[in-house]
Regions:
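Positively charged n-region of N-terminal signal peptides that target proteins for export
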Residues: 1-5
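Bacterial N-terminal signal peptides
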Residues: 6-16
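Sec/Tat signal peptide C-region and signal peptidase I cleavage site
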Residues: 19-23
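Flexible, acidic/histidine-containing loops and adjacent segments that form or flank the divalent-metal
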Residues: 24-27, 81, 103-227, 292-357
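Active-site-proximal loop/helix segments of hydrolase catalytic cores
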Residues: 32-39, 46-84, 95-111, 173-286
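Gly/Thr-rich phosphate-binding beta-strand-loop-beta motif of the actin/hexokinase/Hsp70
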Residues: 38-41, 349
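Local beta-strand N-terminus motif with an aromatic residue
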Residues: 89-90, 114-115, 241-242, 266, ...
Length: 357
């Protein structure tokens, strides 16, 4: 963990270095509805921005191509979140991997908002095209936008600590950290065998982060699945307990390993699923089992969409941002550096507060 990479320095400086001056202010997360892709906007107390992924291009499918940014579904939804947050640029864009539902929206978004720096796992494996058609085109378009800003390739273990804020890369390009972080809990009794990934080329290469803001922790692993996801939890937990876990791969069936929930033990899990994309029945079952173990294990699960997948055990409607595809509400999380946080459903206006653990 010796290397200090530029984007983490920017993130740490923009959030950590201002934490004392911004006492009492929150680190805000907007989980934008991109129909089962990802776009998570993080806004520091002083208004700096980190965006994790940009959703789909165009009309919002894997077959869509970039077009008029004024008509771009996901870029416009991200733009709406930035306006709600009162910000007008993206300081750092982290692209977890190069599938269209994570990297496709960058062309149109870059025409709506300036993007200063880019972080990703490097380049796409040409074999990725054999499993998810269009991946090479998505990467080529992304790389053309990336070339206009600063670029950093993320590597596991790279980090920088500053004034209580910590950003650690825990996975990238198919590799993970090999040594436990400070709060890791050791041997994981829930380990069995790794679930096979639905995609063997890009998803397991996802950039994953453990972000901390004072005592608050948030884990985002992109679409990390298969052996790399398993390696973070088994045979030993390498990360430790987290406050909020954005469930890997939109809660797809290959992210349902109960060993990960045992290792990460989130207070709150968030599913960035769509109506049919992500939100697999095995993951719902694993989350329900964890929540039934008591609030000390998993207090709540919040969903971006009600799932219509066969066997999906949706959680309470009050914890779901969109009940169908006619709306595009987000979930907003506001974290304090004492470890407390709140989640707001923008559809209902309901806010639930989670006190210091």
């Amino acid at each position: 963990m010796r290397t200090i990479w530029y984007a983490v320095f920017v993130i740490s400086a923009m959030i950590g270095a201002h934490s004392l001056r911004s006492a009492g202010k929150t680190l805000d997360f907007y989980f934008v509805d991109v129909e089962g892709g990802q776009a998570t906007l993080i806004v520091s107390p002083d208004g700096r921005t980190l965006l994790i992924d940009t959703g789909f291009p165009g009309s919002g499918t894997f077959q869509s191509t970039p077009g008029d940014p004024r008509a771009a579904r996901d870029a416009q939804r991200i733009l709406a979140a930035t306006r709600s947050a009162g910000v007008a640029r993206i300081d750092t864009l982290v692209t977890t991997h190069f599938h269209a539902d994570h990297a496709g929206g960058v062309v149109e978004l870059s025409q709506l908002l300036p993007i200063a720096s880019f972080v990703d796992h490097g380049a796409v494996n040409p074999e990725a095209e054999t499993n998810v058609k269009g991946t090479l085109d998505v990467f080529a378009r992304y790389a053309a936008v990336r070339a206009k800003g600063r670029h950093t390739t993320a590597r596991p273990g790279e980090r920088l600590e500053a004034d209580g804020f910590d950003a650690v890369v825990v996975s990238s390009d198919g590799r993970t950290i090999s040594r436990p972080l400070a709060k890791a809990t050791g041997r994981n009794p829930a380990c069995a065998a790794a679930l096979p990934p639905q995609d063997i080329y890009e998803n397991p290469r996802s950039v994953g982060f453990l972000l901390s803001f004072g005592r608050f922790t948030f884990l985002d692993l992109g679409d990390l699945t298969g052996a790399p996801l398993f390696a973070l939890a088994c045979p030993d937990d390498l990360l430790g307990h987290v406050d909020v876990y954005l469930v890997a791969h939109h809660g797809g069936p290959d992210a349902a390993d109960p060993a990960t929930l045992s290792a990460f033990t989130p207070r709150v899990a968030i599913l960035n699923n769509g109506r049919t994309k992500g939100g697999g029945a095995p993951t719902f079952s694993a989350l329900h089992r964890a929540s039934e173990a008591g609030p000390s294990q998993l207090a709540d699960v919040w969903q971006l969409h009600r799932s219509s997948n066969q066997g999906a055990q949706n959680f309470d409607d009050g914890r779901i941002a969109n009940l169908d595809e006619s709306t595009a509400h987000w979930l907003k999380l506001s974290a304090s550096d004492d470890g407390s946080f709140s989640v707001t459903n923008s559809r209902t206006g309901e806010t639930k507060t989670y006190p210091v653990r």
